């Protein structure tokens, strides 16, 4: 799903998305608790909001804030047997670590925020760190 709203930021869009999913679940199923396969998802609780860097740190125990540059990121990828292309920069490699180590763990509703600029070059940069952008994905 993709949606836009004027006069808000990405935090406001996350709020809107969270409320929309909660409302739809309640209207369609009569509950904010959903079962999918062997998993139960609880939409009644606040959805987790985590940065991509923090998610990789949580599930891969690697802090990309401590990775100084692209060369170090590529070395780290090699050590973890993560394939990358020569053109990839540090942010691209962060995204590869996210795909390898994090995605499978995101069962409960989660917003992954603050993606690297390399994978979202047209998105508004974070004022406090232009290496990241004000973007989120809902899992």
Indicate residue ranges for each PLM-predicted region.
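A translation/RNA-centric and nucleic-acid-associated enzymatic feature enriched
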Residues: 1-25, 41, 46-139
